[in-house]
């Protein structure tokens, strides 16, 4: 906002005192457009920040306790092994997480583009707040995906000003429920004792899960290796929103690393088949 005011004052001085005012005006126009875009992106992001702040205040009022081996006894053996491998036993139960991503994505048949994102998940009442800044054709395209109160919305705007996509509805709710459960499996395995999950054993290296959040019901099959690592998550309940078509969705994991004494996924992919 300060930059916008400065440009306006500069333009007044240019018009009043400079014979070749058009050259200064062009420079001011460029600065003004950049300042407006920066302000618009910050304003667009403010809803994300406000939502995060609100959920953090609720979470802080919730007392925590430890996740023990007794808590995981009802889970299928490969899921128990995964939780032990992850290092979450005898640690505080997870109430929320913050995830920062650097990556690339693309729509089917289109070119890759880079993105950076910040994401908060809250697990007592499943919530996912995901803010992304993508760069397409040299332009910044921010997007806010939120899943709150069992309802999902996606809002993408060029420079935070011009609508590119706005999606909501039953398909969006179901698709984001898959994403929320995928986050639980990959990013917060301690939450896999959640009572909303119904586990179905398959064999020593795979298990099926049904996850229900209100009217949103999804399922997925989790695949593990002999070490206990979760190596893939496959669901047939994920939609590609811009097409509103249901595709098989998988997230193969190819690398783990140790962070604060826990084995955490370090590299993975999200694939629509």
Language-model segments: which ranges?
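Membrane-helix boundary connector in multi-pass membrane proteins
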Residues: 9-25
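N-terminal mature ectodomain segment of secretory-pathway/periplasmic proteins
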Residues: 80-161
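Flexible, processing/modification-adjacent segments and terminal tails
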Residues: 156-213, 244
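Gly/Pro-enriched, hydrophobic low-complexity segments
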Residues: 208-273
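Hydrophobic alpha-helical transmembrane segments in integral membrane proteins
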Residues: 39-50
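N-terminal leader/targeting segments and the immediate start of mature chains
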Residues: 48-98
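Central hydrophobic cores of alpha-helical transmembrane segments
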Residues: 2-10, 27-29
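Hydrophobic membrane-insertion alpha-helices, especially the h-region
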Residues: 29-39
């Amino acid at each position: 906002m300060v930059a916008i005011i400065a440009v306006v004052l500069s333009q007044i001085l240019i018009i009043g005192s400079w014979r070749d005012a058009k050259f200064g005006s062009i420079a001011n126009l460029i600065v003004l457009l950049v300042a407006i875009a920066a302000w618009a992106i910050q304003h667009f992001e403010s809803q994300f920040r406000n939502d995060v702040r609100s959920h953090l205040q609720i979470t802080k009022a919730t007392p925590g306790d430890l996740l023990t081996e007794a808590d995981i006894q009802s889970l299928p053996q490969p899921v128990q092994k995964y939780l032990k491998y992850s290092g979450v036993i005898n640690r505080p139960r997870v109430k929320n997480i913050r995830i920062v991503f650097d990556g690339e994505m693309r729509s089917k048949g289109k070119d890759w583009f880079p993105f950076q994102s910040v994401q908060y998940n809250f697990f007592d009442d499943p919530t996912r707040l995901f803010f992304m800044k993508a760069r397409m054709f040299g332009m910044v395209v921010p997007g806010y995906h939120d899943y709150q109160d069992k309802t999902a919305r996606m809002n993408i705007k060029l420079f935070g000003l011009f609508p590119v996509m706005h999606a909501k509805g039953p398909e969006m709710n179901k698709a984001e429920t898959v994403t929320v459960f995928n986050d639980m499996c990959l990013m917060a395995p301690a939450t896999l004792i959640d009572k909303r999950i119904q586990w179905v054993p398959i064999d020593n290296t795979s298990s099926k899960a049904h996850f229900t959040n209100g009217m949103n019901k999804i399922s997925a099959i989790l695949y593990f290796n002999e070490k206990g690592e979760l190596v893939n998550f496959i669901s047939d309940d994920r939609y590609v929103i811009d097409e509103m078509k249901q595709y098989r969705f998988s997230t193969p994991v190819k690398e783990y690393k140790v962070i604060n004494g826990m084995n955490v996924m370090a590299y993975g992919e999200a694939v629509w088949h």
